[in-house]
Structure formats: C-alpha cells, structure tokens
C-alpha cells in the first residue's frame, strides 16, 4: 500500500512527544523510506512573523496569514516546508504530492504570501518526519498508527488542535471511545 497522500493518526498509546496525539500527512512513501509533516503541533510563531524574521518584503498592501507555523517533525528543524494547493506559478523546489497538492521547500513561495500569486490554501512547517525503508510500515503493523486517505478540509481548514479528533472521525472513531479504552487498560 502506498501511503502517500494519507494521514497517519497516532494511537493513544504512542507516547513519543514528537507524535503524541498527532496527525501526520505523508508526502512521500517509496522504497527509500517515507517523509511526512506533523499537522497537530503549532509553534508560537505566526506565518507573518516568520516572513518578517526572514526579511521578506512586508508590503503594507499585503494581507499575511495569522495562522501559526507548525512543528512538522523532529528532523530538519531549520528547514521550512510549505504544503499547498496547486498554483499557476511554479516554484524553484516543489514536489508534486497529488495533482492538487504540492510540497515546496524554496523561499520563493514565501515571497508570494499576501499577494494574488499566493497559493489559495497552504500551511507552513518547520521540520519534518522521516522513516527509513519499511520502518513506517512496521510501526503501522505494530498498531502505532491508524491510516486513512487524506482529507483536504482537515489538511487546510481545520485548526491544528482539532485535527487529531477530525482525522479519527474519518474512521468513525470518537475520542470518547479512546478514553474508555484507556481507562479499561489502566484498571
């Protein structure tokens, strides 16, 4: 099963602080391993503040997003990753995840923020998550993750603090079911 364009939903027993109660969007999954972005851990830095820190043109006529930058995972924390809807403009370092979703790592996309050339929908992360070949598949087999096809609404429109619950609901799972299960396991 190719996991690209799928959500990984952390099971409640997953205690790694990088992935606890997380949803990860898988951008790439092949024989060389997997790469994804954690969608549930907001930083205290807004996208507008990130643009200012990076000395991009902060023109008055632009409207910058007040959305928060996400902590995309424990790897490459010094690198930004922008997941976005397809645009008419091509960017220097973009990877096609699906026909409509791209991952861009070049700064030229940031210069479009607040303009008509900006992607209609996007999110910004610092860092990413990576797995060695077969590592992710083994974690799934060990019941660390649930897997569901990605949902663009959850990806771009749901608040990061609500994505874990929303992704679980794609599978018909309510968070109260997990709470009951955990209580039974600890009794």
Swiss-Prot record:
<protein>
    <recommendedName>
        <fullName>UPF0301 protein HSM_1900</fullName>
    </recommendedName>
</protein>
<dbReference type="Pfam" id="PF02622">
    <property type="entry name" value="DUF179"/>
</dbReference>
<dbReference type="InterPro" id="IPR003774">
    <property type="entry name" value="AlgH-like"/>
</dbReference>
<comment type="similarity">
    <text>Belongs to the UPF0301 (AlgH) family.</text>
</comment>
<dbReference type="GO" id="GO:0005829">
    <property type="term" value="C:cytosol"/>
</dbReference>
């Amino acid at each position: 099963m190719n996991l690209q364009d799928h959500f990984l939903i952390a099971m409640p027993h997953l205690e790694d602080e990088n992935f606890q109660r997380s949803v990860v969007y898988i951008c790439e999954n092949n024989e060389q391993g997997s790469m994804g972005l954690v969608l549930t851990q907001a930083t205290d830095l807004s996208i507008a503040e990130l643009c200012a820190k990076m000395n991009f043109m902060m023109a008055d006529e632009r409207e910058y997003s007040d959305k928060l930058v996400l902590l995309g995972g424990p790897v490459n924390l010094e690198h930004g990753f922008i997941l976005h809807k397809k645009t008419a403009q091509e960017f220097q370092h973009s990877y096609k995840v699906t026909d409509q979703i791209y991952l861009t790592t070049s700064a030229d996309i940031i210069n479009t923020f607040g303009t008509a050339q900006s992607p209609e929908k996007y999110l910004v992360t610092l860092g990413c998550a990576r797995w060695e070949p077969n590592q992710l598949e083994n974690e799934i087999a060990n019941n660390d993750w649930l897997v569901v096809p990605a949902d663009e609404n959850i990806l771009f429109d749901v608040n990061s603090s609500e994505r874990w619950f929303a992704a679980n609901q794609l599978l018909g799972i309510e968070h109260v079911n997990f709470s009951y299960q955990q209580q039974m396991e600890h009794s």
